[in-house]
Swiss-Prot record:
Disulfide bonds: none annotated. Pfam families: MRP-S28. The gene is MRPS35. Component of the mitochondrial ribosome small subunit (28S) which comprises a 12S rRNA and about 30 distinct proteins. The lineage of its organism: Eukaryota, Metazoa, Chordata, Craniata, Vertebrata. This is Small ribosomal subunit protein mS35.
């Protein structure tokens, strides 16, 4: 058993010498040749880095005649480092003075008008003057303005009590227009009123469209104008089923060519024939005061419903029409 293991032992000795020589050749440099560590390196992991010296606030560097609109160009929350005023706010504790402006959250909650100084407003007006024109001399009354500009747009900007100057309600756009200012016939007007529902006020003849679906005010304005355009064009369309509408399907009672008009004309012609007076035509009978009163009472009774006033008007008009008074 000893003879076969001798070659293997010799081979291991040769490999050991080789590894020893390789390790000697690549041995690390001595301590004198090592690079010295940087002087700023911490000597201990528990030692803190030195604090950087805080800079003085901006208010101490401001000059008296500086350009204030460049400090507060737009609406922004209160910044104590940029306002050179000894502002204090808060509940005084133990009869002391309110808290100073540094780190005061109460000053962040309320809105400020530091961007709307008289100098800033004057600069804005001077910059916008080149883009403005004089008010037209012909538009000297509200009636003329409504005639030439019938569409009224209402928007609102809000001042919030908080660090943010944005308010989600500012995107809401309200459009108002009178239907009398639109080019609509009787069919188109009734159909448009049916389409808009309770957005139309009959007493003022005003259509109100309120949009708040889009995130931006401009988008809601475009959407409101789009809705008005679609409603206008849809109201002028006449569908096939609309041609088959009867008197009972109408939105409001119409006297012209109605059964009531035909019946009253037939009755009046019979009365005139009995009196041997056939000279009056249909148009002349309809233009008499008695027939006009009867027509108005019937229309009121049909559209407003049965009440004491409409029934009384109808009774009196029938008496005058048949000469029973």
């Amino acid at each position: 058993m000893a003879a076969p293991s001798l070659p293997a032992w010799l081979a291991l000795q040769t490999r050991a010498r080789t590894l020893r020589a390789f390790s000697t050749a690549v041995s690390p440099v001595t301590g004198a040749q090592r690079l010295s560590p940087p002087t700023t390196e911490r000597t201990s992991k528990h030692e803190r880095a030195p604090r950087r010296k805080a800079l003085p606030p901006r208010t101490e560097k401001m000059s008296v005649d500086q350009d204030w609109p460049s400090v507060y160009p737009v609406a922004a929350p209160f910044k104590p480092s940029a306002v050179p005023l000894p502002v204090r706010m808060g509940y005084p504790v133990k009869r002391g003075v309110p808290m100073a402006k540094e780190g005061n959250l109460e000053l962040l909650k309320i809105p400020n008008f530091l961007h709307l100084t008289p100098v800033a407003i004057k600069k804005h007006c001077e910059a916008l003057k080149d883009f403005c024109t004089e008010w037209p001399a012909a538009l000297d009354s509200d009636e003329k303005c409504e005639k030439h500009f019938p569409i009224e747009i209402d928007t609102a900007d809000y001042i919030s009590s908080g660090p943010s100057i944005r308010n989600p309600k500012a995107r809401v756009v309200t459009l108002r227009v009178k239907l009398s200012s639109l080019n609509l016939d009787d069919h188109a007007k009734k159909k448009l009123i049916k389409l808009v529902g309770d957005r139309y006020c009959k007493s003022t003849d005003v259509l109100t469209i309120k949009t708040d679906r889009c995130p931006l005010k401009r988008q809601n304005y475009d959407y409101a104008m789009y809705l008005l355009t679609v409603l206008y064009h849809e109201s002028w369309k006449t569908e096939e089923w609309e041609k088959k509408k009867t008197e009972a399907d109408m939105e409001e009672y119409v006297w012209k060519d109605s059964a009531s008009e035909k019946n009253i004309l037939e009755t009046l012609f019979q009365i005139k024939a009995a009196e041997k007076n056939t000279e009056l035509s249909k148009e002349e009978l309809l233009s008499t005061k008695e027939v006009e009163d009867y027509k108005n009472s019937v229309v009121s009774l049909k559209n407003e419903g049965d009440n004491e006033n409409t029934i009384s008007q109808y009774k009196e008009s029938v008496k005058r029409l048949l000469h029973l008074m």
